[in-house]
């Protein structure tokens, strides 16, 4: 393993172990560091949706500033306004095997450095501000306000994730693999827009619908100006057995997301899980017309086992030197994982039953997870030769990966993935792109 990763991992483990030796467990915590009673499950490590509720009035009256396991908490005396300051950082080490092209692809980088400022104003308006300083590219990832007067119809305005892809909607710090699959190449990330969302029948049905700045597959929007285009986005998700008395079927969900809109201008290329671009349209090809997406999706979690999958179609009208056409790209992915130490698996992340404290025996070793994933992406044959060069651009890519995750504590997570991506060209007889084989190690520190 790369010495840089070993050194950084050892330093974080030592820091974590020292902190644990000085900090009581949750069940032994003193009242001074208890989370306020009305603190949302999503902020205290539960599997609730990404929403923010006000702190209890009783806790707020006893203190207006507190520091506990979920960050720094500022609360007004009436308990109706509060601010939570926390965040996370991810450091990656990526080693590419059998690189025949000679490029220095091996790298060490800070993938994400994201402080989070979120809370509630006057008991009715949630907010979040999340900048990102990772990859030497400072930007604002999220900034929004959400009016929640009606729990079944919350209005959110700002920059946030478009509700389409299941894998993209999962929080970045809860990912099973270091990077998302090929299927997420066809789904937009965070863009400026307005969204109405809510839940029905005691959270059995959840929905989101919104209107966003025109988005590009696999990319983030910016605040500088509105993109040349716009789109309507909608998603519905059903957990039909969430209230069942049988625990094994409660975490089954199925849904579909999609978008319909107009896009013009440049088209982004497609990247492997190692974040190298493997497909590009011709330099003179531009988006010019309707852009639709459809993404059926599902997950199932039972005890330590978890399965997640989705299928994505992105259909885009394009133009190149007076020739117009429609390109319909498709991708799908399936991810499976098991907690070897028996913890509960879930879409909202994993929490170790016992933190890493080797001095207390093997029962205090954190949580260990083994994961497998397969994904593939197909470029429409109509993209060649007018909109992409068949001699250099592949038509098909498939990825298979194996990952091992170690959750030392609720604050520290180590990930090691080995990913293989192979390609097939659009025209038989053309030498395909060289396969990508990459070993990725990541250390995540959250607070």
Q: Residue ranges of each PLM-predicted region?
A:
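Outer membrane beta-barrel
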Residues: 67-264, 329, 333-362, 367-384
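Hydrophobic helical h-region of N-terminal Sec-dependent signal peptides
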Residues: 8-14
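Bacterial N-terminal signal peptides that target proteins for export
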Residues: 1-7
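N-terminal periplasmic/intermembrane-space "pro-region" immediately following the signal or transit peptide
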Residues: 5, 16-90, 340, 344-358, ...
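Glycine/serine-rich loop-strand microenvironments at binding/catalytic pocket rims
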Residues: 22, 26-54, 153, 193-227, ...
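N-terminal low-complexity, intrinsically disordered patches enriched in charged
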Residues: 18-20, 96, 167, 318
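Outer-membrane beta-barrel pore domains
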Residues: 24-25, 33, 58, 99-102, ...
């Amino acid at each position: 393993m790369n010495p840089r990763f070993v050194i950084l991992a050892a330093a974080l483990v030592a820091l974590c172990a020292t902190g644990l030796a000085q900090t009581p467990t949750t069940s032994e915590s003193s009242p001074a560091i208890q989370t306020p009673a009305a603190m949302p499950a999503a902020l205290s490590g539960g599997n609730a949706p990404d929403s923010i509720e006000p702190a209890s009035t009783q806790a707020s009256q006893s203190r207006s500033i507190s520091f506990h396991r979920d960050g720094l908490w500022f609360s007004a005396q009436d308990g109706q306004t509060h601010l939570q300051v926390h965040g996370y950082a991810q450091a990656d080490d990526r080693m590419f095997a059998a690189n025949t092209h000679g490029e220095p692809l091996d790298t060490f980088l800070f993938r994400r450095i994201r402080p989070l400022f979120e809370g509630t104003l006057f008991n009715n308006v949630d907010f979040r501000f999340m900048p990102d300083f990772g990859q030497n590219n400072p930007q604002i990832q999220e900034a929004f306000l959400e009016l929640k007067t009606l729990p079944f119809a919350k209005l959110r305005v700002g920059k946030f994730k478009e509700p389409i892809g299941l894998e993209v909607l999962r929080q970045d710090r809860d990912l099973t693999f270091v990077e998302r699959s090929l299927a997420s190449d066809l789904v937009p990330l965070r863009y400026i827009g307005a969204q109405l969302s809510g839940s029905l029948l005691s959270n059995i049905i959840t929905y989101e619908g919104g209107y966003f700045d025109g988005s590009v597959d696999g990319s983030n929007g910016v605040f500088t100006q509105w993109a040349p285009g716009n789109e309507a986005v909608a998603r519905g998700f059903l957990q039909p057995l969430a209230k069942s008395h049988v625990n094994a079927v409660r975490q089954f969900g199925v849904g579909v997301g999609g978008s319909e809109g107009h896009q013009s201008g440049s088209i982004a290329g497609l990247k492997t899980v190692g974040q190298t671009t493997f497909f590009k349209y011709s330099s003179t090809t531009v988006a010019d017309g309707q852009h639709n997406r459809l993404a059926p999706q599902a997950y199932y979690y039972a005890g330590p086992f978890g399965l997640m999958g989705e299928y994505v179609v992105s259909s885009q009208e394009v133009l190149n030197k007076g020739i117009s056409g429609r390109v319909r790209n498709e991708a799908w992915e399936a991810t499976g994982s098991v907690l070897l130490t028996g913890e509960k698996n879930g879409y909202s992340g994993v929490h170790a039953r016992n933190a890493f404290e080797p001095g207390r025996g093997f029962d205090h070793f954190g949580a260990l997870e083994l994961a497998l994933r397969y994904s593939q992406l197909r470029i429409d044959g109509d993209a060649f030769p007018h909109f992409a060069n068949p001699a250099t651009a592949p038509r098909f890519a498939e990825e298979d990966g194996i990952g091992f995750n170690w959750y030392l504590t609720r604050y520290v997570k180590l990930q090691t993935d080995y990913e293989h991506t192979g390609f097939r060209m659009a025209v038989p007889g053309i030498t395909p792109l060289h396969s990508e084989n990459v070993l990725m190690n990541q250390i995540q520190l959250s607070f």
